[in-house]
Amino acid sequence: MYRFARFDEPLLNKLPQKKVEIDVYHSSIPDKLRRKHPPNIPNLEEQQVVRHFFRLSQMNYGIENGMYPLGSCTMKYNPKICEDIASWREFTDIHPYQGESTVQGTLEMLYELEAMLKEITGMDAFSFQPAAGAHGEFLGMLLVRAYHEFNGDPDRKEVIIPDTAHGTNPASAKMAGFDVIEIPSNNEGTVDLEALRKTLSDKTAALMLTNPNTLGIFETDILEIEKMVHDAGALLYYDGANLNAILGKARPGDMGFDIVHLNLHKTFATPHGGGGPGAGPVGVKEDLEKFLPVPRIKKDGKRYVLDYDKPYSIGKIRDFYGNIEVCIKAYVYLLMMGKSLKEVAEISVLNSNYMKEKLKRSGFYELPYKDLRKHEFVVSCEKLLREKGIRALDVAKRLLDYGMHPPTIYFPLIVKEALMIEPTETETKEDIDAYVDALISIAKEDPEVVRSAPSKTPVKRVDEASAAKNPVLTWKDI
């Protein structure tokens, strides 16, 4: 049984401190600007600070510890060579205000990365400004708005979103000023074509779609969906959250999508969240290129230049040019993978279906909707809840006692007591087998043990609702 490292580690401001008098006198500092008291920050030795954060790191869990199967998050292992190259001084020491002639290498890298992403997705142009996936969605919705306004159709204020869409889609559309209309899935877990047909109108601006969707099911009617959307005068938006499943196998542009956002911090092996920052580049078809944020990188002979002369651009959505170091990591990853990129899709889909089948055959976890899945799948703990009073939340918490990170839970909302699992292509058969064995073992355990979990972690079961409602944002509040 796995046991987490556990330290009784206080906050930095609670560690033993030296009281040091600070001489703030200097003749050039006016009296009214001089400190009367030392700053209210911890006064610690370097060794204390290093040990503090090292201990905290040992109580954390990351992809280096083990499998991290958060559904729709693609928590694959990130090759460390990408981190190494992105940390070169040639990249870290440049400044966005430098002249173009002094950053030709970086501009060339971004130009080539754009060409790679265009080839992978079937788009005609990309912007790297968005700092994350949801930021990319927001840009995509602004592009939709600009497109319809440019074409004299500003009354298109509705964005259609399936109930299996990625979770941030409704918020992004709403922030861009659209009304969100949700349509249901059919009994196979894909878009209900009749519901879509009834919802499309001259008010429809776009349909936002993830393909495969968050159930891990490929939308096999995508070409019919594309025709219906475009016949209605609307645009088709692709959320790239699940692109990992179709890399080198299918392209959103060939399916008829007009706008795509990608997650470099997911599909192209750059760190997520606290290991970030992220990057959510947005690609478009040719007739939308003129609306992309400025500047755009173009090649002028042998030189690369930043082009601000885009009168129809929506402007900027972020300072400078985006999270360039994240782009560097993705660029290195793509160079490493080369033509083997399609194996990412093949192995991720294979791992997902292997794991899904083992869980389904266990008899403890139910698989709603059709059987064949892509890179991820969703099982339900509803049977465990009926028979033993064990919820998906309980299973997730108990997995922590096995030294394993839980999957996404309670999403998508159309599956009751959902466990959303994405093993990714970087996990071995042995890793997957061990995770399945843990899930089966939990299903067989005493319900009270599962409901009281975790018992072996440094922090026990927390009140997530209270934490969200009453955040403590600074150590001064503790």
Model-derived regions, located:
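Conserved phosphate/anionic-ligand binding catalytic regions in large, soluble enzymes, centered on
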Residues: 61-82, 129-137, 268-283, 287-288, ...
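Short amphipathic alpha-helical face segments that pack within enzyme cores
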Residues: 112, 138-139, 143, 325, ...
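Acidic/polar loop patches that form or flank catalytic/metal-binding clefts of enzymes
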Residues: 126-127, 181, 207-208, 237-238, ...
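Conserved PLP-enzyme active-site core in the AAT-like
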Residues: 104-108, 135-301, 389-390, 417
